[in-house]
């Protein structure tokens, strides 16, 4: 069996609010194998976003093991953590966070240029991903010229642009109507599977969660 692309051991995170300590994550253990798509199910406020931020190495304050592609992130410097995130992880958020002054293809090209990819190669990769998501005729449109579903498709393409081993998605369809959400999720899952990436998709929607390979539930700071 292949080694996990993500391994968590006794992951903990607490916050202080008004002199009270709130334990958000209370010893989370999880392994995700290459190519596996896992739903992280839980209600709003259950700590799903906090857990994704931990795996994504987006903030500190966590205790326990966070291992990405066999590397213990706690032993890395800030620059090395950034490189680990860039080289192995992709991100999709509920709100797309696209650059408003760049068109669709440039939003997908940019992270590849940051990673050192040749522009011609990056443009071909971006066009390939956007076309696979049904946006072949919208490549030169800015985010303001795209529908909500189209914007989120661009965000999906951007997340996969650098061929990450793991995609982290935080309520990726939560800002869309049900019909659009279903279509975007179907296209997202198809593309992730085609790329061979693993994914952890946070959602409060059990109906959508059941379309993943596996469902884990975050309840009172631990996984069930």
Curated annotation (Swiss-Prot):
Q: How does it sit in the membrane?
A: Peripheral membrane protein
Q: Which organism is it from?
A: Novosphingobium aromaticivorans (strain ATCC 700278 / DSM 12444 / CCUG 56034 / CIP 105152 / NBRC 16084 / F199)
Its function, per the record, reads: Part of the ABC transporter complex LolCDE involved in the translocation of mature outer membrane-directed lipoproteins, from the inner membrane to the periplasmic chaperone, LolA. Responsible for the formation of the LolA-lipoprotein complex in an ATP-dependent manner.
EC number assigned by the record: 7.6.2.-
UniProt name for this protein: Lipoprotein-releasing system ATP-binding protein LolD
How it assembles, according to the record, is:
The complex is composed of two ATP-binding proteins (LolD) and two transmembrane proteins (LolC and LolE).
Q: Which Gene Ontology terms of cellular component type are present?
A: plasma membrane
What InterPro entries does the entry give? AAA+_ATPase, ABC_transporter-like_ATP-bd, ABC_transporter-like_CS, ABC_transpr_LolD-like, MacB-like_ATP-bd, P-loop_NTPase
GO-annotated biological processes: lipoprotein localization to outer membrane; protein localization to outer membrane
Instruction: List the keywords (alphabetical).
Output: ATP-binding, Cell inner membrane, Cell membrane, Membrane, Nucleotide-binding, Translocase, Transport
Give all residue intervals belonging to the ABC transporter domain: 6-224
Would you say which domain of life the source belongs to? Bacteria
Name where it's found: Cell inner membrane
Record carries keyword Nucleotide-binding: yes
One GO MF term, please?
Answer: ATP binding
Q: Which family does it belong to?
A: Belongs to the ABC transporter superfamily. Lipoprotein translocase (TC 3.A.1.125) family.
* Amino acids binding ATP: 42-49
């Amino acid at each position: 069996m292949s080694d996990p692309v993500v391994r968590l051991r006794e992951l903990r995170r607490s916050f202080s609010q008004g002199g009270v300590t709130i334990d958000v994550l209370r010893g989370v253990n999880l392994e995700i194998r290459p190519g596996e798509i896992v739903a992280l199910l839980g209600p709003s406020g259950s700590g799903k976003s906090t857990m994704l931020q931990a795996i994504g190495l987006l903030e500190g304050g966590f205790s326990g093991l966070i291992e990405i592609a066999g590397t213990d992130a706690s032993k890395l410097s800030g620059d090395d953590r950034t490189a680990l995130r860039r080289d192995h992880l992709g991100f999709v958020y509920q709100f797309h966070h696209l650059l408003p002054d760049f068109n669709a293809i440039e939003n997908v090209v940019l992270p590849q240029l940051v990673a050192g990819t040749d522009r011609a190669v990056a443009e071909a990769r971006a066009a390939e991903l956007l076309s696979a998501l049904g946006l072949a005729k919208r490549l030169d449109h800015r985010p303001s010229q795209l529908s909500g579903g189209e914007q989120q498709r661009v965000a999906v393409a951007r997340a996969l642009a650098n061929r990450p081993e793991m995609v982290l998605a935080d309520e990726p369809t939560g800002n869309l109507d049900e019909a659009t959400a279903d279509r975007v999720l179907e296209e997202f899952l198809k593309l992730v599977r085609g790329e061979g990436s693993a994914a952890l998709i946070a959602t409060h929607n059990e109906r959508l969660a059941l379309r993943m390979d596996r469902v884990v539930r975050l309840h009172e700071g631990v996984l069930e």
